[in-house]
Every structure is written in structure tokens, then in C-alpha cells.
Amino acid sequence: MDIAIQHPWFKRALGPFYPSRLFDQFFGEGLFEYDLLPFLSSTISPYYRQSLFRTVLDSGVSEVRSDRDKFVIFLDVKHFSPEDLTVKVQEDFVEIHGKHNERQDDHGYISREFHRRYRLPSNVDQSALSCSLSADGMLTFSGPKVPSGVDAGHSERAIPVSREEKPSSAPTS
């Protein structure tokens, strides 16, 4: 039996068979016209894809950077306060969990929860890890790298989330 596998790039081109925002992270934030009638955007022009990249960039997608000197994770958590977030390190992984109870917004009541897990490079100094939340809701998790051959230290511990009053300097891609 052959199963057709479709690349995510073409997923939105199928219009009404794959609703763009009905079941993703934006659930409960209200719908736009093209969410209910996604095939209309393709009638304007076959090259017009309004929500393809906007949805990806605004859906809480994280950015991981690992260069020679440091390891950094940027994660959009604008709907969560520092009290709603838990960041902990277990072995070679960092786990970021966010949950807020049901609260009222413009469209009714909503509760949110997410869980992300990232593998830390083996040369990240786990004793010097830090995590901060900017005023615009960007969580930044970072840690310096140590030279090869130096013990980076591995232990299970919680990382406190500090609040910054200035907006994030993270790229918006």
C-alpha cells in the first residue's frame, strides 16, 4: 500500500481540507475571514498565501541558537507570566512548561498549556544557565559553553524565570 506523504509547504494549498487556525495555538482567539473560507485566498492569485508564514511565525515557534560560545533558546510565551512558567534541567535536556488556569478574554474563557523539551549540547555549563522573560513575552534561556574536556556538570534542577522590563532583542524572523 502506497501512502502519499505531503511536504508541509504544500499543506496550506489544499485550502478547506486543512483549516489554517481552527486547531492550532490560536484556538480561542477568534477567527479571520480566510480561516473560514481559505479557498478564497487562492482565487485572488495562485501565488497568494496570506497565512502560510504568518501562522508559522506567530504560533510560538522557538528559535534555537548554538554557536561557539553559548547556547540560546528564544520562545514566544506572551500569554504566560513568570509564575505560569516552569523551566528545569534534567540530564542533557531543558524542559519548559507553561500553564495558566482558565481566564476570561475578549472571546470567552480560555486556558493554555504547553510543554517543550530541548536537548542541551554536552559542552553547555549547566551551573551557569539562566532564563528571563522580556516585557513583550519572549522567553530567553541561555547558557555558556565550556571548552572541550572540561566537565560541564549534569544535575537536575529548576531554573528561575526572571522578568525583564525591556522588550526582547530576539529576532522576529
UniProtKB/Swiss-Prot annotation:
The modification Deamidated glutamine is found at Q6, Q50, Q90. The modification N6-acetyllysine is found at K70, K99. It comes from the Eukaryota. Zn(2+) 3 binds at H154. Zn(2+) 1 binds at H79, H100, E102. One of its GO terms (molecular function) is metal ion binding. The modification Deamidated asparagine is found at N101, N123. PROSITE patterns: SHSP. Residues 153-167 have a biased composition (Basic and acidic residues). Keywords: Acetylation, Chaperone, Cytoplasm, Eye lens protein, Glycoprotein, Metal-binding, Methylation, Nucleus, Phosphoprotein, Zinc. It is found in: Cytoplasm; Nucleus. Residues 144-173 are annotated as: Disordered. Pfam families: Crystallin, HSP20. The modification Phosphoserine is found at S45, S122. Acetylation at Lys-70 may increase chaperone activity. Residues 1-63 are annotated as: Required for complex formation with BFSP1 and BFSP2. Residues 52-162 form the sHSP domain. Belongs to the small heat shock protein (HSP20) family. Contributes to the transparency and refractive index of the lens. Acts as a chaperone, preventing aggregation of various proteins under a wide range of stress conditions. Required for the correct formation of lens intermediate filaments as part of a complex composed of BFSP1, BFSP2 and CRYAA. Heteromer composed of three CRYAA and one CRYAB subunits. Inter-subunit bridging via zinc ions enhances stability, which is crucial as there is no protein turn over in the lens. Can also form homodimers and homotetramers (dimers of dimers) which serve as the building blocks of homooligomers. Within homooligomers, the zinc-binding motif is created from residues of 3 different molecules. His-100 and Glu-102 from one molecule are ligands of the zinc ion, and His-107 and His-154 residues from additional molecules complete the site with tetrahedral coordination geometry. This is Alpha-crystallin A chain. It comes from Sus scrofa (Pig). The lineage of its organism: Eukaryota, Metazoa, Chordata, Craniata, Vertebrata.
